[in-house]
């Protein structure tokens, strides 16, 4: 034996010791190796502001399980880790900290702020990386990247410049999503929607001479000062005579035209819609079609500007109250209705987002989306589960241009340089900062804005491998293999990686997207600070161990679906760890320092053939499950095989032989135990890396590390289907006899004769398994026969797959006393049935009791009736 196992398993000691060894030995490191197939996963980079939560724990457990599986299958595996600069989140955090010190970022300036931000990143940015190590993540930490490191910045700048030169990046004054709190633009994907109870205000717009009027319904009366038209459907006969005429904006007094546009739904409200091009994306498009003026009335911080007079200086909500009151006085407010609608909020601060026009940088997405759609349609990129194709297509088919500029300082600064000569006005977009304007020679200054975080994250699969340089890693590992991610960032991240991969590299970024859901609490609620139901993975690891947490996450998760997490599942996983550990100690104690040879196939008995056949079958099934990303199914199969078939059955079958006198049989049993335990540890390793390494290293002939050991393969050498089926039949008999003994209160130490009535063709199996029947069923003798002749009167029986098993009771228990006891139980159960039936038959109880109480009473009645039937059957058996 290479090492002796202590009496109890100390996960803290094992995990810290093994992880340090793994990293020191370079087991996680990957190199371009033409002799092996590459397999690469890029880690979804967690924000540097974050700390490990259950979502990270699930995401990285799944990735690590896949990587460890592929590594054991001979692939050159690269799991490339890194962190995201998280532009808005990080800047908000640093600004908040500075505010506590009484410092405003604008007072210290950009350079000083960025210096502070980099210091903050150095101090806190590695926290989550340390926590990922605690999970057992086998990342190649030598290749760890950061979305704002020098290499990523070069890639981001080059992509921006190249797309700009192709006309796919442009600057324009367009409608965007604006967060007045974060003070920055947001992309469509960064806006979340919440249903809010509000109102629908019906407002009358009068003709200049009051000769006609038109009524519009709006959810945002505060935007009325920015109205530039009223739109009606061209097919709406009610307004045919009014198209081309004008009305007056209430309170403001400005004349605006009535235009015809198919965007308007005749059936909604009055069929007339006020058009505010600067504050609604649909209105903006109507404004473009009809060449309407643009009047922006909101400031960046959510107040009314001078064009919003007479409400200048008010917040949007203050303006809403004021203009509604003014329209009531003027008679323009027709009615107010209660109305629930979706309101956009910032995905970071959750404050209301304002649609408004602003001069920003955009990516033209429709031309880029075509190839990104094709590669999924044609199966080059597969989503697992496949239903997420629909989610992806819904986004891509309706994609709009992406606003990529952010009014922040922390991030990749836009590589655009503006000539300061007002007569020139040239904009130079270039990789290298120009010293002067290339057109007129005047001074230039760089754009103040930074790029959307997801712009740089979209290049993660190739920027991390060295692009734009042609590195050996890029050549070998790109396209990467599998992306593991939550369904909540398919729009944010997955779609954009496919867009950038197909455009920049001319190749897909990965061939499979394995999608998982979110981790919810035991009640199915999303974990949140407000609910106080968050669970700290590090606390779970401290109490139960990383393996227990990992196993509970893998077995509780199915692809694409949310999962419920509870400590009970972790406790069950810890119990499994203890079961595996104790079984391994048993094997180790019985092997000692012996040299263990190969299995002698000529000396296998029926139990040996059964366990080797089952090991072989499980290895094949688990391999198929892993290849199909059915990780939860694979983990559960390994669990069930180890717990039930190996520990509960084969080890118990092996014990008499280990202590027997046949030396060659003892040696063969030991060889089988070592083989089955070793292969079981390999099958379990992707999910529980620490305990499997520890136990594997306790076995003779163990390789340097289990993570580089060969994955168990299905082999014809261990195909014993016939013997395995026969052994399963014998085990069914043993289970039935155990159940009979328990039902009849036969003391465990009392041995009994067993009569087995079975067809003649089954007799050899019972002869081969006679020793196991006698030990595991508590039998003193096993009589196998084809009929019921000679079976003692009063014997109890159980029907099994291979026939019928009988055990006589007369010498095992005092039958008269047992009859007396059973009769007492029957009377008690009859009383319980009568009580429950009386209660449920009482109209007063049924009318007044809560449904839950009634259902509980019905359940009690069902249980009592079932127990009564069993007791009466037992009494009949006892009475013969």
Show the residue positions of the predicted features.
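Non-catalytic terminal extensions that flank enzyme cores
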Residues: 1-54, 77, 334, 347, ...
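Residue patterns forming the tRNA-binding/recognition surfaces of aminoacyl-tRNA synthetases
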Residues: 3, 8, 17, 21-25, ...
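N-terminal catalytic cores of NTP/NDP-binding nucleotidyl/phosphoryl-transfer enzymes
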Residues: 33-94, 147, 156, 216-219, ...
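Short, solvent-exposed turn/loop segments enriched in Gly/Ser/Thr/Pro and often Arg
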Residues: 34-36, 44-45, 78-91, 144-152, ...
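Conserved phosphate/anionic-ligand binding catalytic regions in large, soluble enzymes, centered on
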Residues: 51, 214-232, 348, 354, ...
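Secondary-structure transition/capping motifs at alpha-helix termini
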Residues: 68-76, 97-110, 130, 134-139, ...
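Feature 926 captures the class I aminoacyl-tRNA synthetase adenylation module centered on the KMSKS loop
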Residues: 202, 394-455, 459, 503-546, ...
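Protease-associated
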Residues: 210, 214-216, 221-275, 279-285
């Amino acid at each position: 034996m290479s090492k002796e196992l202590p009496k109890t398993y100390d996960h803290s000691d094992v995990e810290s010791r093994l992880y340090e060894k793994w990293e020191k030995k370079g087991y996680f490191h990957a190199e371009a190796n033409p002799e092996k197939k590459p397999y690469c996963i890029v880690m979804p980079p967690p924000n540097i502001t974050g700390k490990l939560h259950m979502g990270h724990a699930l995401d990285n457990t799944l990735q690590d399980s896949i990587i460890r599986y592929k590594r054991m299958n001979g692939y050159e595996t690269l799991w490339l880790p890194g962190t995201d600069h998280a532009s808005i989140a990080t800047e908000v955090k640093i600004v908040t900290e500075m505010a506590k010190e009484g410092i405003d970022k604008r007072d210290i300036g950009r350079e000083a702020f960025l210096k502070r931000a980099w210091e903050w990143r150095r101090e806190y940015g590695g926290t989550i990386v340390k926590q990922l190590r605690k999970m057992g993540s086998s990342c190649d930490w030598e290749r760890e990247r950061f979305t704002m490191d020098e290499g990523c910045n070069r890639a981001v700048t080059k992509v921006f410049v190249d797309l700009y030169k192709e006309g796919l990046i442009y600057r324009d004054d367009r409608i965007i999503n604006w967060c007045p709190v974060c003070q920055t633009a947001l992309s469509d994907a960064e806006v979340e929607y919440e249903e809010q109870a509000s109102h629908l205000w019906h407002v009358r717009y009068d003709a200049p001479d009051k000769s006609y009027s038109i009524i519009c319904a709006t959810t945002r009366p505060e935007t009325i000062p920015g109205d530039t038209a009223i739109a009606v459907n061209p097919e709406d006969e009610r307004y045919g005579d009014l198209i081309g005429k004008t009305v007056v904006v209430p309170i403001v007094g400005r004349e605006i035209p009535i235009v015809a546009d198919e965007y308007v739904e005749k059936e909604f409200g009055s069929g007339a819609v006020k058009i505010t091009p600067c504050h609604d994306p649909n209105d903006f498009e109507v404004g473009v079609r009809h060449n309407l003026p643009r009047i922006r009335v909101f400031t960046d911080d959510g107040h009314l500007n001078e064009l919003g007079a007479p409400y200048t200086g008010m917040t949007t909500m203050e303006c809403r109250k004021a203009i509604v009151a003014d329209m009531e006085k003027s008679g323009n407010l027709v009615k107010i209705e209660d109305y629930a609608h979706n309101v956009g909020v910032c995905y970071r601060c959750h404050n209301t987002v304002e649609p408004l026009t602003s001069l920003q940088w955009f990516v033209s997405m429709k031309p880029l989306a075509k190839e990104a759609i094709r590669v999924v349609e044609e199966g080059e990129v597969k989503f697992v589960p496949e239903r997420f194709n629909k989610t992806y297509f819904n986004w891509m088919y309706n994609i709009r241009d992406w606003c990529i500029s952010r009014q922040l300082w922390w991030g990749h600064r836009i590589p655009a340089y503006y000539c300061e000569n007002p007569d020139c006005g040239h904009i130079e977009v270039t990789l290298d900062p120009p010293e002067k304007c290339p057109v007129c020679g005047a001074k230039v200054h760089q754009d103040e804005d930074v790029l959307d975080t997801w712009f740089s994250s979209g290049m993660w699969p190739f920027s991390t491998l060295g692009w734009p340089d042609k590195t050996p890693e890029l050549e070998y590992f790109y396209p990467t293999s599998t992306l593991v991610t939550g369904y909540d960032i398919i729009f944010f991240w997955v779609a954009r990686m496919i867009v950038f991969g197909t455009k920049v590299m001319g190749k897909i970024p990965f061939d499979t997207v394995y999608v998982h859901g979110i981790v919810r609490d035991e009640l199915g609620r999303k974990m949140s600070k407000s609910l106080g139901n968050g669970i700290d993975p590090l606390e779970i690891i401290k109490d139960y161990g990383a393996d227990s947490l990992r196993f509970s996450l893998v077995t509780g998760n199915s692809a694409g679906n949310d999962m419920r997490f509870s400590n009970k599942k972790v406790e069950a996983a810890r119990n499994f760890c203890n079961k595996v550990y104790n079984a391994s100690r048993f094997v180790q104690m019985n092997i000692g320092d012996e040299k263990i040879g190969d299995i002698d196939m000529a000396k296998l008995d029926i139990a040996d053939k059964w366990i080797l056949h089952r090991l072989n079958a499980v290895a094949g099934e688990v391999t198929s499950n892993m290849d199909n990303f059915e990780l939860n199914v694979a983990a559960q199969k390994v669990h069930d095989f180890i717990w039930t078939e190996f520990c509960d059955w084969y080890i118990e079958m092996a014990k008499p032989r280990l202590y027997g006198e046949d030396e060659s049989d003892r040696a063969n049993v030991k060889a089988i135990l070592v083989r089955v335990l070793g292969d079981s540890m390999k099958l379990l390793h992707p999910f529980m890396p620490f305990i499997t390494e520890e136990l594997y290293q306790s076995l003779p002939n163990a390789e340097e590390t289990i993570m580089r050991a060969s994955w168990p393969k299905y082999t014809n050498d261990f195909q014993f289907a016939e013997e395995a089926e026969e052994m399963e039949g014998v085990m069914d008999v043993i289970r039935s006899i155990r159940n009979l003994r328990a039902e009849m209160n036969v003391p465990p130490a009392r041995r009994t004769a067993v009569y087995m009535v079975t067809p003649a063709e089954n007799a050899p199996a019972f002869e081969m398994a006679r020793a196991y029947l006698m030990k595991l069923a508590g039998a003193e003798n096993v009589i196998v026969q084809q009929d019921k002749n000679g079976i003692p009167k009063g014997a109890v029986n159980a029907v099994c797959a291979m026939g019928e098993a009988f055990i006589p009771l007369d010498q095992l228990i005092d039958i008269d006393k047992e009859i007396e006891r059973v009769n007492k139980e029957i009377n008690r159960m009859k009383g319980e049935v009568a009580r429950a039936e009386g209660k449920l038959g009482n109209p007063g109880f049924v009318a007044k009791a809560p449904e839950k109480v009634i259902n509980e009473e019905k359940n009690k009645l069902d249980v009592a009736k079932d127990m009564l039937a069993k007791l009466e059957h037992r009494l009949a058996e006892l009475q013969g």
